Regions:
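Membrane-embedded alpha-helical bundles of multi-pass transporters/translocases
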Residues: 1-222
Length: 222
């Protein structure tokens, strides 16, 4: 939801509008949003890492019939879940760049994931280690690299400062009042995917088939 357009749809108009009036005020607003996003994502990922078995039960209850499959799902999910943290923060910096009419870096950043995944397969063959584990670590690494790349390009226009002291003013409240409806509307697609995964988890290989079908569906959306 945050990484695939919902956040940008709410943030860019607010930030760009503030930027047109006063850059300092716009940057203060962006810093508050960044710190809130950082804290929320960090807590969410940390809780998910701790309670991953329970999370897998909610997402794919059918895996509980096979202890070996369940353990693999939990282990791999714990490895790949930090990707969510990195990619959402990367999306934030992509929104900053878009607000300055700089689109190339944000548009090209997803290529990093493909390059890292392909490279990890060559590495796993060369090092004679598990393809599955290598790809899982590669996903989180790719998310981290996307964040670093977009931060590098955005730093000329915006420099984030991490702090836990965040004043929730009217602008922040207004921003989240616009973000919540976007989350609910965009969440319909995610709920469909979740329901499909829950049902598919009871059939061997069905989750993979569902994922491949979704990839085909996403082709026309780039």
């Amino acid at each position: 939801l945050f990484a695939e357009g919902t956040f940008n749809a709410a943030f860019i108009p607010s930030y760009a509008g503030a930027l047109a009036k006063n850059k300092m005020n716009a940057d203060n607003f962006a810093k508050k949003v960044f710190n809130l996003l950082f804290i929320i994502l960090f807590i969410f990922v940390l809780v998910a890492e701790i309670f991953m078995p329970q999370l897998i039960f909610l997402i794919a209850p059918g895996f509980y019939k096979d202890p070996e499959k369940l353990k693999l799902a939990v282990d791999l999910s714990r490895i790949t879940f930090p990707f969510l943290f990195f990619i959402c923060l990367a999306s934030f910096f992509g929104a900053i760049l878009n607000s300055y009419n700089k689109f190339a870096a944000a548009a090209a950043a997803p290529i990093i994931l493909n390059i890292v995944l392909i490279g990890s397969l060559f590495f796993s063959q060369w090092a004679n280690i598990s393809d599955v584990l290598t790809l899982s670590y590669a996903v989180s690494l790719a998310g981290f690299l996307q964040l670093i790349v977009l931060l590098f390009f955005a730093r000329k226009n915006f420099k984030p400062i991490l702090t836990t002291k965040i004043k929730i003013d009217k602008k922040i409240k207004f921003f989240f009042s616009k973000l919540l409806p976007s989350i609910f509307s965009s969440g319909v697609t995610q709920i469909n995917i979740l329901v499909g995964t829950i049902i598919a988890s009871f059939q061997a290989g069905a989750v993979s088939y569902l994922y491949y079908a979704d990839r085909v569906y996403q082709i026309n959306l780039a």
